[in-house]
Amino acid sequence: MIADKDGTILCVLAGRWRYAISQAQIEHFGLIDPVDAPIDQRGHPLICRHLATLLGDAEVLAPGRHHAMTVVLRRRSVALLVNHIDNLDGTGPYEIHPLSPLITRRLTLPWFLGAIIYQDAPLLLLDLHRIATDVAIGAV
């Protein structure tokens, strides 16, 4: 399967690890300080969570403004905070490789769409909509 028709796969640094994301799942990119109690475009409080913490990385971002990816759900919006967001250097579109059943069965949460090969190494492709949904319903 090809990632997006226009190849909009980005790389995020969340804690110590890099992941691939689909730009199509993001409503807005920006800088957010969660202490400021940000609101979404509908005037509701924006739910802010550190993506690295959700993915099991113990490294915590320092207080202050962080790169944020806002995912809009039906009733709420979730801002996933990361260390850095960047374009992938190279040619797209990228082919999404499914995760093997062995790996998929061992995942605690089904937050990965597959993997792409970038600079001869795999990058896990995150399902940001699924992550945001789990955050919004309080599952994590």
Task: Describe the residue ranges of each PLM region.
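An acidic, low-aromatic, low-complexity terminal/linker signal
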Residues: M1-V140
